[in-house]
């Protein structure tokens, strides 16, 4: 309530002062003084609301507002919002704008009664705003569901008059919330509908499940009938009895040819198993998931590869020929006959050098090669003289073993004076006839896969000559092989 110029208060509660006609300019000067006396910062664009309201009320009474309040009155007339102020600062007698003021408020941590009341009020107002938002969201969802429900009910009335059994629209089918609402409505009004909504959806889902099952069975039957029609032309037909006859004929034809690799396995194992109790039949979950085709393809591929691999007979002579390509076919055949067709035993015999005695043809051929090899019988290997096995030679103790290995001395026409065979040299362990210091692949002649030829005559023709004053341990430099000078080479 404001005090009027005559000292009376307005009992009506308004701000309309009773002024005399001669004093029309007095409120203007008073307004100027009041407006200039209020401490307002330069950032404020408008004066306080109380002052604006009092000025507006005085303007309605016929008092012209001052020139400084034209902007404020224009802002109020245009409907600009009021600038929010900090409540904590207002409680302590300071007016400050709230925008950007939260961090810099000097009373933000104040715990007085007024500030505590303000904090509690802000908390309650925030809870009210959150509650209103939640209620508005629930109302909007309920409106949408009611709209869908009304559309479904209108569609059900139209289709019931036409004789159709489906009463739901596509939108209702796609919305789970609408499904719940429709189910609740059906339970509330049991007499209005004979079939509940959830049963209709279950029927649709079951129909969708049965479609891939039928497709899978049809594809299996078509794949089953193709190979059967090629082999059994007399059982072709369109009826189900003919199809079963074809399947039985195909199954009976499979065990008749177990060794052939051209047997066609059925891609549908349920037809071959003969029932659901068999371990190879697929379960309903496999059929629904659609993975039985991939599993059947992998299973058929592995079974076909195994059948083709196991059905091919292995030739033991061919196996020996691949393992020992340097051996002659007749020799390998004789070893295999001696071992009674056992490939493993024949390989062990060849590797251990315990072959049977060669026949007369092999002996004659070995004698010819041995005679040709006599020209180059004197050679040095890794610094050890094999040509003249005297008492000073390092291999002189091996001469006593020549009688024990006499049967093997003619293999590949190796020199009998060496007292060991090339096979025994190549495949012997370090603890046997040799002490392991001779490499089995120093020369091509020692490799069992290659025939031993007298190539020493022209391997190193006269490149290195042995001096007469050098001992035998300096005959080879770097493990190379060369000739010892004798009467033929001089």
Curated annotation (Swiss-Prot):
Gene name for this UniProt entry: Dmrta1
Stated name of the protein: Doublesex- and mab-3-related transcription factor A1
Ranges of Polar residues composition bias in the record: 217-242, 269-289
Consequence of gene disruption: Mutant animals are viable and fertile, with no obvious anatomical defects. Ovaries from mutant females may have an elevated number of polyovular follicles. 25% of mutant males consistently exhibit copulatory behavior toward other males.
Skewed-composition ranges (Low complexity): 20-31
UniProt region (Disordered), positions on chain: 1-31, 152-171, 207-289
CC per GO annotation: nucleus
Superkingdom of the organism of origin: Eukaryota
InterPro entries to which the protein is assigned, alphabetical: DM_DNA-bd (IPR001275), DM_DNA-bd_sf (IPR036407), DMA (IPR005173), DMRT (IPR026607), DMRT5_1_DMB_dom (IPR046472), UBA-like_sf (IPR009060)
